[in-house]
Amino acid sequence: MPGQRGELLARRENGQGLHHLVWRLGPGWRVCSSAVLGGGIGPRAWILNAQVPGGYPRLDPDRHLAEIATAEGLGGPGAGLMTAADVTAYTTAHDGGVTATVTSGLGVRGWAAAPAEGTGGPLAPGTVNIVVTLPVALSDAALVNAVATATEAKVQALLDAGLDCSGTPTDAVCVAAPDPGTDAGEPFAGPRSLWGARLARAVHRAVLTGAVDSGERDATAGAALRGSVPQA
């Protein structure tokens, strides 16, 4: 399905080169997501995953994403995600018609159930963003189930990559599927259902590849930084 593949695009903001991924779904799609723009469940014509600089200064990320969408000619309702990770290093995996695309940046990671209380204030842009597209319609419950399944697969992949964490504080998940119309749609998307299992495997492979690649990039950057420090 054409809408299942994201398109990598470039832009400049304040003199800095940045990238974003766009899924031009068109009519007849529903999305369930934790996106900062257009989150929740409903019809969505597009999905945007935009890179922003580290130390993101703006306090209106939803408006910022809407501006990027407008510049790309994206009309109608959509879902917008944000990340400080290198979007050009995105990873993709496929399984039985399900496509998972992930942008990974794991510099600020930890466990969901941390002992300290949350800050309650705005957080830095999410660093593990997952976009999943399916070729079959899902019921409302199955869409929510699919987001949970994707999250479980993400944590499994991070552990398999040797990371002691469940993710980063601002990870986001976005699941897109055709509108069921008068049909109820697939009722289940848990990890032991047909489509949930395919989703889980695709997400696991994409996150695992992204986590390993991210670790290698961090190690290379760290070595370069150490090499630039004058030795006593």
Where are the regions that the model predicts?
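Alpha/propeptide regions of enzymes that mature by internal proteolysis
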Residues: 1-232
